From Swiss-Prot:
Species lineage: Bacteria, Pseudomonadati, Pseudomonadota, Gammaproteobacteria, Pasteurellales
E.C. designation(s): 2.1.1.-
Binding site for S-adenosyl-L-methionine: 145, 166, 188, 230
InterPro entries noted in UniProt: Ribosomal_L11_MeTrfase_PrmA, Ribosomal_PrmA_MeTrfase, SAM-dependent_MTases_sf
Annotated protein name in UniProt: Ribosomal protein L11 methyltransferase
CDD domains associated with the record: AdoMet_MTases
SUPFAM superfamilies referenced in this protein's UniProt entry, alphabetically: S-adenosyl-L-methionine-dependent methyltransferases
Name of the coding gene: prmA
Length: 294
């Protein structure tokens, strides 16, 4: 069976509305792509992660009247009358296999690998985290996750306690445990993330050393040797007082989910409490790390 695809550019704000509308008028699937044509496979728990200008890509049955689809979109007022779009025919494929083929084992730092379950482990002697794309944000494919994993690999986590603030899939907490941490604590606002983290921890044999809490249920006076938060710049600034208290004196802090253009404002929220390192950038994203002063 052949398909026809329409691709149109949208603002972040309107992308989900357009997606819902396209599904209502017959799209068999709708995906989001960023401006670099990279599929966004990693939704935050409870929402769709979008950044920059977003392309909405919808797949229809090949017999669909695409002129009518375009006309209906215009009438919906979700797009401008002269909105740019591209329509192309798509050959039939084994889409599940195509999707799986896009994921490969990835190395972070010197020791750490993230491996999909259907791939052969490249180095059995390395620190291997088995993780499949699934319920929650975090598989290693996004630059912010990569920045955080590389940082964790650089630390001596032996017998340390690590807090993963905004744990998503649990990838960072699980990686920390596999890298030698004694205990990890994952905190997230969404129950979906807690479920995903628990499942992934069980697959990796570290569930007995991982505690998980919804934000509203987290214990008072939590504190750790290492705190990592891969969320977004806004929450990192708003929640700075809370995040700062989670780090022991002389403990390590790692922050990401931050665009390079937002780094300065995030640093200002933490610089009085931490001796901050040089900012590390990857593509348009960055990582902020530091050691707590007291």
């Amino acid at each position: 069976m052949a398909w026809v695809q329409i691709r149109l550019n949208s603002t972040d704000r309107e992308a989900e509305k357009i997606s819902d509308f396209l599904e209502d008028i017959g799209a068999v699937s709708v995906t989001f792509m960023n401006s670099q044509d990279t599929p966004i496979f990693e939704p935050l728990p409870g929402e769709t992660r979008l950044w920059g200008n977003t392309d909405v890509v919808a797949l229809f049955d090949a017999e669909t009247d695409m002129k009518e689809i375009v006309s209906t979109l215009v009438k919906s007022k979700l797009v401008a009358t002269d909105f740019p779009y591209k329509i192309e025919q798509i050959e039939d494929k084994d889409w599940e296999r195509e999707w799986m083929d896009n994921f490969h084992p990835m190395q972070f730092g010197k020791r750490l690998w993230i491996c999909p379950s259907w791939r052969e482990i490249p180095d059995p002697n390395a620190v291997n985290v088995m993780l499949d794309p699934g319920l929650a944000f975090g598989t290693g494919t996004h630059p912010t996750t990569a920045l955080c994993l590389t940082w964790l690999d650089s630390l001596d986590l032996t017998d340390k306690t690590v807090i993963d603030f905004g744990c998503g899939s649990g990838i960072l907490a699980i990686a920390a445990l596999k890298l030698g941490a004694k205990k990890a604590i994952g905190i997230d606002i969404d129950p979906q993330a807690i479920l995903a983290s628990q499942n992934n921890a069980e697959v990796n044999g570290v569930a007995d050393r991982l505690q998980l809490f919804l934000t509203k249920d987290q214990p008072q006076n939590l504190i750790a040797d290492v705190v990592i938060a891969n969320i977004l710049a806004g929450p990192l600034k708003e929640l700075a007082p809370q995040i700062i208290t989670l780090v022991k004196p002389q403990g390590n802090l790692g922050l990401s989910g931050i665009l390079a253009t937002q780094a300065e404002s995030v640093c200002k929220a933490y610089q009085n409490s931490f001796k901050l390192d040089s900012i590390i950038e990857k593509e348009e994203w960055c990582r902020i790390t530091g050691i707590k002063k007291h």
